[in-house]
């Protein structure tokens, strides 16, 4: 069963990420400096830009916290029994998706702060959207009686659409639209509406 290997899969995925990161960084293929900045200057994220494997070492490596939190979630979920009422107890598709999105936040942000590349910024935005749309869509699932398959279909449709569109048109999709901002505002309004219903 997959849940017996979940922690091993999560740790192996992160180990592969760091191995590839260091191989590409060592080869010089993927490191850059954000436009308008130079090595030794202070970045817009308040850290001096380094010439090492991580352009912003503290900002990049602080994302290990997301990775460890996600792996810890996977470890707990793989040991719990599914209750049927709470989507976040036991090894359910939604709980695993949430833990995976937490893990993904780490490499996503690390790529931005570590590489200073346009695609590093892109994957950072994708990882944030991957995480924030889960509670947003979960409220739609609850309020509209969606099945898990409907929830997952909507999630991956939004995430893939955002990923492709933001690659070609930027994170505001070329129309000054912030899916991340919309997600946080919509989530707040949905929670307020849900509270009124109870």
Language model feature labels by segment:
Residues 189-192, 196-198:
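Single conserved hydrophobic/aromatic residue that forms the stacking wall/gate
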Residues 2-175:
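Early transmembrane hairpin module of multi-pass membrane proteins
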Residues 130-136, 183-190:
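Alpha-helical transmembrane segments and their membrane-interface exit regions
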């Amino acid at each position: 069963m997959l849940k017996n290997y979940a922690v091993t899969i999560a740790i192996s995925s992160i180990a592969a990420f760091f191995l590839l990161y260091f191989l590409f960084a060592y080869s010089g293929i993927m490191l850059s400096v954000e436009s308008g900045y130079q090595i030794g200057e202070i970045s817009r994220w308040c850290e001096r830009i380094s010439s090492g494997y991580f352009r912003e070492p503290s900002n990049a490596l602080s994302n290990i916290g997301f990775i460890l939190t996600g792996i810890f979630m996977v470890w707990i979920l793989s040991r719990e029994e599914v209750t049927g009422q709470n989507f976040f107890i036991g090894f359910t598709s939604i709980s695993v998706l949430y833990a995976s999105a937490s893990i993904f936040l780490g490499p996503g942000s690390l790529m931005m702060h570590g590489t200073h590349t346009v695609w590093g910024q892109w994957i950072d935005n994708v990882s944030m959207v991957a995480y924030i749309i889960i509670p947003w869509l979960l409220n739609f699932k609850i309020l509209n009686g969606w099945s898990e398959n409907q929830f997952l279909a909507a999630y991956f449709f939004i995430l893939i659409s955002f990923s492709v569109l933001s690659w070609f048109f930027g994170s505001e999709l070329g129309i000054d639209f912030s899916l991340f901002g919309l997600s946080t505002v919509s989530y707040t309004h949905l929670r307020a509406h849900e509270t009124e219903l109870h």
